[in-house]
């Protein structure tokens, strides 16, 4: 049975209830004939992006039991402090030194060290984290940085080629290639801990080889644009077996912008519980195709309720974007801030309607939440 694991390398060195699920020149991909076989050549893309990916090392101290053998007996001698290191990757997103990585790469870190592709080693400051998307923002002070330009994950298509760049097994600046296998995957891998905002999972799935240490690395397209932050793999043993997942850059950029400005993500919520549609449900509603997500519950006095949405409505679009799964709805709503006016399209009693929703934060207001 496959399990989902975060791709992090570790070593020992010494409305809170609402919104849940029930025009530049392109770097062309060319082909190189080799004994009758044609291979895609991504060397230009790799050269343009590899300097934008960094190696991250974190250090944390843990208290562990100390045992000692005494005349054949194991005696508990209390506890001892040991340093543990974890390794991952990060993506430079600005000339000012901001770096996107995964929350699980830097979680509980007491020290964070970044190694650039040119071998410079610099300390990093943690600007903020967003456990709901498993993202974190770091900042370093260094000259001559080469950030990877942002792409558009919305326009990414299943089947298009991509590169994954990271540091698997501490093998720095490793590039692997594949295609986008699927979009809007909700894998249930971000743990919903008490007091945390609802997880947002709408991953890009790829078959590019990803292994421990790739966490926080880049997923780039054939135009040398960043379209995702590598996060996890699906594997029975924790190593690559053909399935890996990345956070869409359109979502990641909003998280980075908010952490940079506020220290906390300003995330909008509708205040609904939804159920994904099935063919039988669509037939019962008189629909010829399976589409939208069904509002199983509308939280009283929250955003959707105030806009007139009701239990049993079929939500079809958010901000003009079709939402046919819980993941798609969460991603689209999560890109907006509390107070944003968002147009939604829904189906009720055989007719399609539209309304405008004023999104709220997880506390049911439109106020800015700061760290």
What are these regions (language model features)?
Residues 2-7:
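Sec-dependent signal peptide recognition
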Residues 13-14:
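C-terminal motif of bacterial Sec signal peptides marking the signal peptidase cleavage site
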Residues 17-284, 288-291, 296-300, 326, ...:
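Serine-dependent protease modules
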Residues 92-93, 346-349:
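Short hydrophobic alpha-helical segments used for membrane anchoring or interfacial signaling
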Residues 96-103, 303-326:
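Conserved PDZ fold ligand-binding element
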Residues 121, 352-354:
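A structural signal for beta-strand boundary/capping segments at domain termini and interdomain linkers
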């Amino acid at each position: 049975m496959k399990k989902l694991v975060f791709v992090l390398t570790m070593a020992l060195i010494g409305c809170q209830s609402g919104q849940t699920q029930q025009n530049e020149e392109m770097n062309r991909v060319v082909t190189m004939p080799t004994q009758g076989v044609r291979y895609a050549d991504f060397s230009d893309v790799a050269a343009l992006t590899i300097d934008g990916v960094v190696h991250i090392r974190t250090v944390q101290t843990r208290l562990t039991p100390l045992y000692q053998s005494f005349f054949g007996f194991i005696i508990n001698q209390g506890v001892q402090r040991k340093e543990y290191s974890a390794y991952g990757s990060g993506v430079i997103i600005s000339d000012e030194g901001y770096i996107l990585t995964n929350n699980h790469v830097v979680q509980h870190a007491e020290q964070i060290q970044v190694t650039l592709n040119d071998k410079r080693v610099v300390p990093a400051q943690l600007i903020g984290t967003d456990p709901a998307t498993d993202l974190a923002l770091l900042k370093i002070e260094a000259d001559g940085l080469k950030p990877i330009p942002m792409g558009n994950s919305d326009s990414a298509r299943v089947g298009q080629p991509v590169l994954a760049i990271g540091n698997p097994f501490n093998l720095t600046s490793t590039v692997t290639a594949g295609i986008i296998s699927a979009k809007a995957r909700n894998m249930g891998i971000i743990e919903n801990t008490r007091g945390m905002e609802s997880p947002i999972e709408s991953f890009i799935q790829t078959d590019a080889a990803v292994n421990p240490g790739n966490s926080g690395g880049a997923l780039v397209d054939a135009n040398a644009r960043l379209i995702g932050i590598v996060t996890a793999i699906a594997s029975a043993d924790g190593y690559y077996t053909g399935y890996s997942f990345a956070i869409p850059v359109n979502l990641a950029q909003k998280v980075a912008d908010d952490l940079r400005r506020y220290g906390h993500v300003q995330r909008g919520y509708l205040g609904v519980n939804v159920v994904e549609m099935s063919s039988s449900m669509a037939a019962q509603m008189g629909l010829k195709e399976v589409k939208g997500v069904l509002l199983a519950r509308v939280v009283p006095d929250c955003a959707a309720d105030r806009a007139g949405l009701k239990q049993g409505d079929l939500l079809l679009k958010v901000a003009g974007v079709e939402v046919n799964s819980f993941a798609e709805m969460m991603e689209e709503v999560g890109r907006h801030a509390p107070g944003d006016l968002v147009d939604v399209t829904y189906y009720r009693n055989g007719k399609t309607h539209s309304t405008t929703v004023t999104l709220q934060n997880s506390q049911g207001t439109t106020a800015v939440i700061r760290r």
